[in-house]
UniProtKB/Swiss-Prot annotation:
Protein name per Swiss-Prot or TrEMBL: Probable transaldolase
A Pfam family hit: TAL_FSA
Role: Transaldolase is important for the balance of metabolites in the pentose-phosphate pathway.
Similarity comment text for this entry: Belongs to the transaldolase family. Type 3B subfamily.
EC number in record: 2.2.1.2
Catalytic residues (positions): K83 (schiff-base intermediate with substrate)
GO function term, MF aspect, one: aldehyde-lyase activity
CDD domains assigned to the protein according to its UniProt record, in alphabetical order: Transaldolase_FSA (cd00956)
Upper classification of the organism: Bacteria, Pseudomonadati, Pseudomonadota, Alphaproteobacteria, Sphingomonadales
Amino acid sequence: MKFFVDTADTAEIADLAATGLLDGVTTNPTLIAKAGKDFIEVTKEICGLVDGPVSAEVVALDHEGMMREAEVLRKIADNVCIKVPLTVDGLKTCKALTGEGTMVNVTLCFSANQALLAAKAGATFISPFVGRHDDNGFDGMDLIRDIRLIYDNYAFETQILVASIRHGVHVLESARIGADVITAPPAVIKGLFKHVLTDKGIEGFLADWAKTGQKIV
């Protein structure tokens, strides 16, 4: 399973990229606003920090407007992935862009039927929002299971990119189900490294090692 980080904070991205475990980045207008930088410039900077896909979202709502914005965004770097909303015009844009060889991430997916349409439109990635689904009284992971089943039934190549991840359980369940990618905030990804017993184990080993009076270097 691939790990993307959901942020436009270049310092956080660089920190995670240094682990060698980061496969890509997702951004959205809200994250760009939080970064407080020029959209084009920060996207270019992010594309230089990772080799994998960097999702940059259009803000136009009509097909023609989306295509114009996508033309600007995909010139930033070869690893830019155009992010479009799951609407009629969004899927028209997806079909056109993927037909030209451009990666497309279809976002704001909340039903398996929507995911089916995105796959038929040739989406590179589909982004179902599990956290927001949970917030509205549904089980977000059930949505991922349904999409996985449908995509496997028809051998769709669209990758399931689980979004709106709130905690480590979402990551674990995504892996169990067989999602292709997860995207999570930096804090959630960093939290995966941590376990209280790991910390206690290190403390114990170091205490015992200190008693030997030895050094390795």
